[in-house]
Amino acid sequence: SAPDENDNIDQQVNILDEELARYPDVIAISSVDASACSVQFDLAIENGIPIVAFDSGNSYQNIQSTCKTNNIEAVTTGTKNFCEKIGDSGEILLLVHDTVSDTAKEREAEIKNELAANHPNVTVTETIYLDQLEMLKKQIVAEQVGVTPEELAAAEAGEKKEETTGTGDASETIADAASNAASSSADESANETAQEADNELSEKMQQVNDGAAKMSDEDAIQYYMEKHPDLKGCIATNETVTQLAIRTLDQFDSEKHITLVGFDAGKEQVNALKDGKVDGLIVQNPFGMGYATVVAAARTVLEIGNEAEVNTGYVWVTADNMNDDTITPFLYE
């Protein structure tokens, strides 16, 4: 069982609750959020149900075994090859699949560590997190219509308060928050009344919300590509953001080649690799990971012990080696 979306933490917790109610012999889980599910895990342990993690680990202390890619080794390999392709200098975008999962945190940290240690002339100009993309869309439109970051933050805080309390009119809440931001602005026109400022900013906030709702994920990523005309490339940290980067580059009208290195090798990534849209892929071993997880789960039930962490491997794939016999087993549709 899995959530409908990769980042749906609440749904994963609900699924875990349902599975625990069946009192399974063992739980194997790839955690959406590295710090989530501790209550469910405590319940599992209390009922003698061991836990095995795979793909993305969890900070919970009583997990029997974690079967996953060694992200430090994999990301170091990918980052070195990426830097070689861009001439070991220039501006890049980092596209990270979320802010909460173990894999996202590890991969982002190691990319930046490798760049700082061995590629000082390569600069990450923007780090974009997929689970923050909706807020980034609002920031983009806000900049275009003249809403300051402080005003946007105040309005967002007002909207969240309205959602929590369930009282009052949403437009009034935005206006109140906007009033607070506007009243603190040093350059507010002296002859403009507070009510006029409220109304004007409330109208702009409506434009922000409407504009953000119409903006696609690809449009948002393209905005940041266009914002940095000297951009040389992008590194994407999982399959979802790699596919997003591919679609963005398809619609991005640029005369120069933007180097793209991503993770995993589904059908879309493999086709993009063939077409030269992707320059390299860090590909995990999905079959090996699944096999290792089943073995680890069986060993916990049989009480014969496990390695705390099982490295399931990876390969570096390019258009030049993708048809090699050692590579094709890692590719999937």
Regions found by a protein language model. Give the residues of each.
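A residue-level marker of the well-folded mature domains of exported/periplasmic proteins
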Residues: S1-E333
